[in-house]
A protein has these predicted regions:
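Short, small/polar residue-rich loop motifs at catalytic or cofactor-binding pockets
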Residues: 297, 412-415, 437, 485-487
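Extended C-terminal subregions enriched in glycine
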Residues: 363, 367, 461, 478-482, ...
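Short beta-strand scaffold segments in enzyme catalytic cores
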Residues: 154-166, 416-420, 489-491, 577-583, ...
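Active-site rim segments in enzyme catalytic domains, especially the processed small/beta chain
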Residues: 148-165, 169, 173, 284-286, ...
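Terminal signal-anchor or tail-anchor transmembrane helices
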Residues: 40-68
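Noncatalytic scaffold domains of N-terminal-nucleophile
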Residues: 32, 57-308, 312-317, 363, ...
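Internal maturation/activation junctions in enzymes
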Residues: 92, 244, 266, 283, ...
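Short, low-complexity, Lys/Arg-enriched N-terminal segments of secretory-pathway carbohydrate enzymes
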Residues: 1-39
Length: 606
């Protein structure tokens, strides 16, 4: 049993475990972080993922540990970069399973739904909705559940972005709980050894998830905790194996305190252990860095597309680029006779817009040290989209220099996304990450937390890429700065009913942005059923490399049409996952679909 536990730990563990103090339960502490009031109840329900599923699914955990070895951006490969025998994960997609059989992955509901990568977590989130919890409650529960099971891509050692949109005329709110660099971070810290931004303690930024899912109000925490941890209800069976009791104890502490203070307090039971582990593996984070962490809460950025309001996450997420892309396509008339985005001129316009989006994204970045607000304003301006549209030809593409990228685009890594809708019409779109698989490969032996390597999403000066482009000055490392992200959690509202119509987001590194962009176009431009939006092959272009990547099983005509217009086209295995919810504005019927075809996800609803 001990050997099995050790085998699941990432390779960087603190070498001096004797210096760590065992976490002890504390009285409730006051939360210093000022997050949105609607998050107050969420933590009361969220720890359900602990014993109900997250920590007893050793088989699931070990399955993904082995299956995703050598994987980047959600794509299963061997260490030589070719598709390995582990493509069994994607067989339902690669084999073009019978469409009638696929219908079982379409969930139809009347009240609420959850769509995420892990079937058990969708079910657990839906159970929270059934018990009267809000979409935020269910989202927090789902996030912690995914982090317990799929800790290779998410967890409380990471961060992310969230969009919350209540029904009615209340505006959408954006929560930025992206990880932050510490006070001693600087732009040249990886110049001598770039690998240190990926592996070990120096790659770790201050996690943000717990700050986002907590609030200073304790309320019914004790009562809800008793329900979640009633030992008579635990779904343990003879022979069941729990691999991560230290993480269970950590989540226990957070649940009992009901606030983020227990996580970030310099004198608390968690932060000192994390700082010791980070420092013992080469890092520079301090207790003050944890104490100073805050969640940025503000209005989502919005735009109109085909008569709907699109709300998504602002800079340093890639929401401004998503809005820009929709502004570009929204100015075109729908191509005549085009039944989908995979049809001649429609595909050409889609890919050309993606190339312009790739150029614009290199100018995003947290404005902590360099103010890029004027650039962001220009990117969001419909006049900028008009200029781009006049430079898109229906007949041919151009060399990458034509699109004038200012800087090298940083290529990020894997994530987890889920979408939630409750009976009151509140929608939540949330994307979380630890960056690379198992983050920095550092796990704290006391708390059981797998720590992110989000510092790798920053740019390092002094180098040029193969295209002679410098790294983006807007994404250089600076103290307390958050790195650029491809995340674009999005909620789209029908302006007639004032109810959410489409809740969408994706996981998969640089392909997140283009996947969500294509999903919105497919659903709102071409009226594709949600099942087809999620399962159909996708196309990706990020300008550099100057290649259109086409997922397997895409019609050969798509390749032919693109090559005829001068594009270089390459086939790839499925490389991103989407989980979405669509609400019919007329009937109110809810459709929820998780990406079974790429990651075996399954939605749930009631």
């Amino acid at each position: 049993m001990a050997d099995e536990k050790q085998a699941l730990l990432p390779i960087y563990a603190a070498t001096d475990s004797t210096s760590h103090s065992k976490p002890q339960p504390q009285a409730p502490l006051e939360l210093k972080s000022k997050t949105h009031r609607m998050l107050a109840r969420g933590i009361h329900l969220a720890i359900a993922s602990l014993m109900l599923i997250g920590l007893i699914y050793g088989g699931v955990f070990s399955h993904f540990t082995s299956s995703f070895r050598g994987c980047h951006d959600g794509r299963v490969t061997s260490h030589r970069g070719v598709v390995s025998d582990r493509t069994h994960l994607f067989l339902p997609y690669l084999a073009a399973a019978d469409k009638d059989d696929d219908k079982k992955h379409l969930v139809t509901a009347k009240h609420g739904a959850v769509a995420c990568d892990v079937p058990a977590c969708s079910t657990l989130g839906t159970e929270i909705l059934k018990r009267g919890g809000s979409a935020v409650d269910a989202s927090i529960t789902t996030a912690l559940c995914i982090g317990s099971i799929n800790s290779f891509s998410s967890g409380i050692g990471g961060g992310g972005f969230m969009i919350v949109k209540p029904a009615g005329d209340e505006n959408a709110t954006a929560f930025n709980f992206r990880e932050k660099a510490g006070r001693y971070a600087h732009k040249d810290m990886y110049k001598s050894n770039p690998l240190l931004s990926k592996f070990g303690g120096l790659a770790v930024a201050v996690p943000g998830i717990i700050a986002a899912v907590s609030d200073h109000e304790h309320r019914e925490m004790r009562e809800m905790f008793d329900w979640l941890f009633d030992e008579q209800d635990l779904p343990l069976t003879p022979g069941a194996r729990a691999f991560r009791p230290n993480l269970a104890h950590t989540l226990d502490l957070i649940a009992r305190n009901g606030s983020a203070a227990v996580f970030y307090d310099p004198e608390g039971p968690i932060a000192p252990n994390l700082v010791r582990t980070v420092k013992s593996t080469g890092g520079i984070l301090t207790l003050e860095d944890f104490a100073d962490y805050d969640v940025e809460v503000g209005p989502a950025i919005t735009a109109l597309f085909r008569g709907r309001e699109v709300a998504t996450a602002p800079n340093p997420a890639s929401g401004p680029i998503l809005i820009n892309g929709l502004n570009v396509l929204g100015g075109f008339e729908k191509p005549m006779q085009a039944p989908s985005d995979f049809e001649g001129v429609a595909t050409q316009r889609l890919v050309e817009t993606m190339k312009w989006m790739g150029a614009g994204r290199s100018q995003l970045g947290d404005p902590v040290d360099i103010d890029n607000s004027a650039l962001i304003k220009e990117i969001l301006d419909p006049k900028w989209a008009d200029m781009i549209r006049t430079n898109i030809s229906d007949d041919n593409t151009h060399p990458w220099q034509f699109y004038s990228p200012a800087y090298e685009g940083k290529d990020p890594h894997g994530t987890a996304h889920f979408s939630v809708l409750d009976a009151d019409g509140m929608a939540v779109s949330m994307t979380t990450t630890v960056n690379l698989l198992f983050g920095s490969l550092v796990v704290d032996p006391v708390t059981g937390i797998v720590l992110n390597n989000e510092m790798d999403d920053f740019s390092t000066p002094g180098t040029r890429n193969a295209f002679d482009l410098e790294p983006s000055i807007y994404n250089y490392i600076a103290p307390f700065k958050r790195p650029l992200s491809s995340c674009v959690p999005t909620v789209i509202t029908d302006l007639t009913t004032q109810w959410p119509e489409f809740v969408i987001g994706a996981a998969g590194g640089s392909k997140i942005l283009t996947s969500v962009f294509q999903a919105i176009v497919r659903k709102l431009e071409y009226g594709m059923p949600l099942l087809d939006v999620v399962r159909a092959p996708r196309i990706h272009h990020q300008l550099l490399p100057d290649v259109a990547y086409l997922e397997m099983l895409a019609p050969e005509t798509v390749r032919n049409e693109l090559e005829k217009r001068g594009h270089t086209v390459k086939s790839i295995a499925p490389a991103s996952t989407m989980n979405g919810i669509y609400i019919n504005p007329v009937s109110g019927i809810i459709h929820a679909v998780s990406d079974y075809w790429r990651k075996r996800g399954q939605a749930d609803g009631y």
